[in-house]
Amino acid sequence: MNISYYTIQAGLNPAVGFGYAGKNIVKSLNNLGHAVSFANPKSTIQLNFTQPHHFKLHRSQYQIGYTPWESTSMRLDWVERFNACDEVWATSDWCAQVFKDNGITKPIYVYPHGIEDIWKPRRRVVKEGQPLKFLHIGEPSPRKDGQLVVDTFIKLFGGNPDYHLTIKAHKFNTTRVYDKDNQFGSPEIAYGNITLITDELEETDLVSLYHSHHVLLYPTWGEGFGFIPLQGLATGMPVISTYDWSHYMDYMGPLKLKSKLTDETLPKAVGDEHIGKMFRPDAKHLEELMREVSYDYKAYSGYYFAQADKIHEDYNWDQLTKKAFEHLVEKFS
């Protein structure tokens, strides 16, 4: 089948979610024998994978509108653009329900993202003399709440060499703390057991970063899909994350982080303003889970490692893509 793929220029960058997902969508379509071109009005179908106001809707072409979203409300012009498509795709059941609740009337299908083989499971142990290493990825997005991670880590383990926190930021970091001299600055300057990484990493280096850490901390207010927790889970890593938004919540396990659906606004210093409600992470529960996993790491490590192979089976890109396009293959064959 001839398929046109469309996104904006920024959506081609594999260092961000749209680009990373898009790369794998196109690759899996090619693996399945489909011919994929870019913004081609002559193709039978066009998959628009970007924010709805950027959709490129050619006439006389079957149009699919596909985007992730993180809150309970959407812009009215987004709803109009979705309804101008022939069908709409969502990245999770939660996201699909949000689309329906906001007035999208076209058929809605769920096409979750997948995981690549490179995210291999690894059994993790804390060796004698080695610190328990926590990892947070997502700065500078306020939605990923890196500040909550830093504040909680310092409260529990600040300055304790038996514990370490790595903050992996995309180019820059917004988390701030006061040091012993009451100076306000970046946490890795004030605490010797906190490390900051701002460089963009190749995928192999990113996988190695996951493999070299013991616990992923991800108190997000919501995700369109949530690659970061899925990648951690696929490597067998214990993950502390909110989950109500998640397509893969069944794999979140005993470290699921409680949250509350609220209309409290996020900080607006970085990123787009979100309207509607989002899932505010429970700060006290995050503290409890971090203590719990540090007390009994061996048990949690075993639990999450044991389910990793099943995650790779359920979130295989080729299988997910084949299922998503089955009704279109039947319709246009």
Predicted regions mapped to residue ranges:
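Nucleotide-activated donor-binding/catalytic signature segment of Leloir-type glycosyltransferases, i.e.
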Residues: 177-207
